Amino acid sequence: MTPPPASQKASEKASVYQPSQQGLYFPKPPVFQSVEEERLHRKQRLAAVCRVFARYRYEYGFAGHVTVRDPEFPDRFWTNPFAMDFGRVRVSDLLLVDHAGTVLEGNWAVNQAGFVLHSAIHQHHPHVLASCHMHTANGMAWAALGRPLDPITQTAAGFYNDHAVITEQAGAVVVDREAGQAVAAAFGDNKAVIHQNHGLFTVGRESVDEAAWWFIALERACEIQLKAEATGHPLKLISPEAAAHSAKHLATPMAAWLHFQPIYDAVARTEPDLFD
């Protein structure tokens, strides 16, 4: 199966990066003609995110999960199979799960902790289309500090006033629904959270690509601040005004989608079996 075009020419201003010169190709999210087409697109992108996270060495045993809502049945979501190597996940391997934890499509088990948390996030926040959580080294190290990130780079500024530290169920394996609901409620309207003593969560309001990019950027921001603080020198913070300006222009759903396109293109070109 070959993937559909990932983008098309823009007909209107979609990003500060969009050129003013006419006739140039500029990526733009696709427009779907049917719910089936949109479902396939979301599943393809979710499988691609699994491959990308494997490339980036975000895997840690069976820990980690990514999800996206079904476009026709918003109370159901697609997710990766439990204990399957992220580097081999294909479109046909993805599981369709409801909020009761029932696997409606697929024949693999679902990650129980992943189901409890992601199901609660999707239930509590109807604006969330996709979510990502992995046990990454930098994310877990920063989560152990129980602090939000400081605006010390443009990357970190992208999360200015749009990420939070969650202390509910800190360090505990969340496998019961009440615990999952508590974490989801504390998530608020943020696009990212640092779950103390656990790791990072990100969500996408408009696309799977968005959620994936926020996770990549958040993991990088954690790494950068850990390294900067390790020097022992005081951090030079970006001013609140400049951080807010960067967040407004560089941290939009469209900007995140654009950032993910070259990453997606690379994995789609070199690992076409993900579309099987």
PLM segments and residue spans:
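Short, flexible, solvent-exposed loop/turn segments with mixed acidic/basic and small polar residues
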Residues: 93-95, 155-157, 189-193
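Short acidic/polar capping segments at secondary-structure boundaries
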Residues: 84, 136-139, 146-147, 170-173, ...
